Curated annotation (Swiss-Prot):
One of the GO biological process terms: regulation of transcription by RNA polymerase II
Cross-link for Glycyl lysine isopeptide (Lys-Gly) (interchain with G-Cter in SUMO2), residue positions: 61
Entry keyword Nucleus: yes
Protein name: Zinc finger protein 225
Gene3D superfamilies registered for this protein in UniProt: 6.10.140.140, Classic Zinc Finger (3.30.160.60)
Organism: Homo sapiens
Lineage of the species this protein comes from: Eukaryota, Metazoa, Chordata, Craniata, Vertebrata
Gene coding for it: ZNF225
Length: 706
């Protein structure tokens, strides 16, 4: 025979409310509370195989113990004095007295002492030597072998007597059945509370946000969201919770046990509810639907957070920036933006984040996990939202239309970001350089430039990138993959954005217009660079010669002059060029192709820029004016040469005689004089001349004679 060790006491299972909490209970809830407490006590007595004094137990069963009409009284005796403090509460014309928090603490302590005195007489069955322990919820914590097995639920117990008690609880009659859903209850009061769910009856309203509840206890718990009250503290770390259940869930974090494992991906969770919510990722199920906008969510928590979007009232305001929030927790998280606090740390790389969801997104970068696959093309995504947007690409569905230009978008956020292109709004500013962005995502990407962060490395060449998309585009250079094809001309591209921009060549669309001169461009970046022509800003400086440029592309092209790099080679003659456009124009010389024709005189040119310069001959336009003497020129090259006359600058020097010359053409003539070379040949007589000028003079004389 063994005695019960660490058996549960009545104080352990007692649900003790404070006076304020008790005042919030209505009549039906108080009756339900009474019945539950009495049943807990009966269960403990059955475990002990003894009972209290008959008068004491009947005293506990009387309703006046739980709901009194008069003021403070003293009544009853249980192994000593039990002080009963009565309180009158007026509600709807009736008086319903409530016993106080201190009263029940005293009663539960006395009942526990009485139970402790009975421990020595507790007898176990001879079935097993090891006792079991009963926790505060009257569930069984098994210690060793469990030979006795329940017939109904297959639950195992260490002792037959406890098994008998368990079977009694299992067989307890639930005589009150809901007509709507068939759910059964032991008490009629519990059934009445449950029926409010079907009727949609919500008697209790929140004064702050107007949310309605069908139970006053639910309202009380909800109000803690607005007040920030967290009465349940973790003894390990001191973290507070608004609900007792939240504390129970949190305590399992300290143990580290994750018994619930997903069969699909093997991910482990502390609670079964977390596993069920996670499994909806694989199934795609979203059972929680917003009544206002019909948007669906996987969890009720996400639905509740979404509901705040529709709430007009945002009572919690930030003192620093004035931004308002519907939840106090959201305000607390927002304050970290101002304080710079980042409480969520990545264990892989040590990076910290303000928001937990940002940490979750970041961790996927390390794991590379992409659990969401497109059935059409097999493409994988990290998030279900990414897959949802991608599916619309195959279906061609563009639900969201821009009212300005009629352009369609797959998501409302894309449309919202696009509309800023029309308004010019850039609400996201970089604190380092002051640059503005239309989207927060673009700002986050930009800030990596200041931090020098480039976490994505190419395995082929070792080059690093700040973004995964840039690495993906770069890898196509090595593989030669160009998955995006133009349906008009068949040209292929490595990026979808390049194809999108290229299509404007066929459509002639130039949506970006300069407000200064009216010139239009196919890309916003082209317009941005063009504006510097009017402002005169040249932010890109060459470190070799100090020359400034209005775009980084022009600077890169210029630097090839110093490095001598000419990566574009002509297969016909082997000549090299520093620009792709130059070799394209050069190839036309071999093919005698001159696609650009002057409408005035019919003269044709290999380059559009040549035609543009030639047309100034007909229009008389001379846009380049000398600030020194006021003389105007048709071309920038002649203007630059003319300015050397004023500055007395002679940059070109003959290597043979050391003579300094202003014009490159004069330098070439000088070098021909030194070498005796005659490169200009008359096609009629075959005579050669050192200079083109001499040949032109001869031809003019010949033409005049004829």
């Amino acid at each position: 025979m063994t005695t019960l060790k660490e058996a549960v006491t009545f104080k352990d299972v007692a649900v003790v409310f404070t006076e304020e909490e008790l005042r919030l209970l209505d009549l039906a809830q108080r009756k339900l509370y009474r019945e539950v407490m009495l049943e807990n006590f009966r269960n403990l007595l059955s475990v002990g195989h003894q009972s209290l004094h008959r008068d004491t137990f009947h005293f506990l069963k009387e309703e006046k113990f739980w709901m009194m009409e008069t003021a403070t009284q003293r009544e009853g005796n249980l192994g000593g004095k039990i002080q009963m403090e009565m309180e009158t509460v007026s509600e709807s014309g009736t008086h319903e007295g409530l016993f106080s928090h201190q009263t029940w603490e005293q009663i539960s302590s006395d009942l526990t002492r009485f139970q402790d005195s009975m421990v020595n007489s507790f007898q176990f069955s001879k079935q097993d030597d090891m006792p079991c322990q009963v926790d505060a919820g009257l569930s069984i914590i098994h210690v060793r072998q469990k030979p006795s097995e329940g017939r109904t639920c297959k639950k195992s117990f260490s002792d037959v007597s406890v098994l008998d008690l368990h079977q009694q609880l299992q067989s307890r009659e639930k005589s009150h059945t809901c007509d709507e859903c068939g759910k059964s209850f032991c008490y009629s009061s519990a059934l009445r509370i449950h029926q409010r769910v079907h009727m949609g009856e919500k008697l209790y309203n929140c004064d702050v946000c107007g949310k309605e509840f069908n139970q006053s206890s639910h309202l009380q718990i909800h109000q803690r969201i607005h007040t920030g009250e967290k009465p349940f503290k973790c003894e390990q770390c001191g973290k507070g919770f608004s609900r007792r259940s939240g504390l129970y869930v949190h305590r399992k974090l300290h143990t580290g046990v994750k018994p619930h494992i997903c069969e699909k991906c093997g991910k482990a969770f502390i609670h079964d509810s977390q596993l069920q919510e996670h499994q909806r990722i694989h199934t795609g199920e979203k059972p929680f639907k917003c009544d206002i906008c019909c948007k669906s969510f996987r969890s009720r928590a996400n639905l509740n957070r979404h509901s705040m979007v529709h709430m007009r009232e945002k009572p919690f305001r930030c003192d620093t920036c004035g931004k308002s929030f519907g939840l106090k927790s959201a305000l607390n998280s927002h304050r970290m933006v101002h304080t710079g606090e980042k409480r969520y740390k990545c264990e892989e790389c040590g990076k910290r984040f303000i928001y937990r969801q940002d940490l979750y997104k970041h961790q996927i970068d390390h794991t590379g996990e992409k659990p969401y696959n497109c059935k059409e093309c097999g493409k994988s995504f990290r998030w279900a939202s990414g897959l949802s947007r991608h599916v619309r690409v195959h279906s061609g569905e563009t639900t969201f239309k821009c009212e300005e230009c009629g352009k369609g978008f797959y998501t409302n956020s894309q449309r919202y970001s696009h509309q800023r292109a029309h308004s010019g709004e850039k609400p996201y500013r970089c604190e380092e350089c002051g640059k503005g962005y239309k989207r927060r995502l673009d700002l986050d990407f930009h800030q990596r430039v200041h931090r020098g962060e480039k976490p994505y490395n190419c395995k082929e060449c070792g080059k690093s990138f700040g973004w995964a998309s840039c690495l993906l585009n770069h890898q196509r250079i090595h593989s030669g993959e160009k998955p995006f094809k133009c349906e008009e001309c068949g040209k292929r591209f490595t990026q979808n954005s390049q194809l999108y921009t290229h299509r404007r060549v066929h459509s002639g669309e130039k949506p970006f217009k300069c407000e200064e001169c009216g010139k239009r461009f196919t890309q916003n970046s082209q317009l941005y660079s063009h504006r510097r022509v009017h402002t005169g800003v040249k932010p890109y400086k060459c470190e070799e010669c100090g020359k400034g440029f209005n775009s980084k592309f022009n600077l890169d092209m210029h630097q090839r002059v110093h490095t001598g790099e000419r990566p574009y080679n002509c297969k016909e003659c082997g000549k090299s060029f520093s620009r792709a456009s130059s070799i394209l124009n050069h190839k036309r010389l071999h093919g005698d192709e001159k696609p650009f024709k002057c409408e005035e005189c019919g003269k044709r040119f290999t380059e559009n820029s040549q035609l543009h310069s030639h047309q100034r001959v007909h229009t008389g336009e001379k846009p380049y004016k000398c600030e020194k003497c006021g003389k105007s020129f048709r071309w920038a090259s002649t203007h630059l040469t003319h300015q050397r006359l004023h500055s007395r600058e002679k940059l070109l020097q003959c290597e043979d005689c050391g003579k300094s010359i202003v014009h490159s053409s004069c330098l070439k003539d000088q070098q021909r004089d030194q070498s005796g070379e005659k490169t200009s040949k008359c096609e009629d007589c075959g005579k050669r001349y050192k200079r083109r000028l001499n040949l032109d003079t001869l031809l003019s004389l010949f033409l005049n004679d004829t």
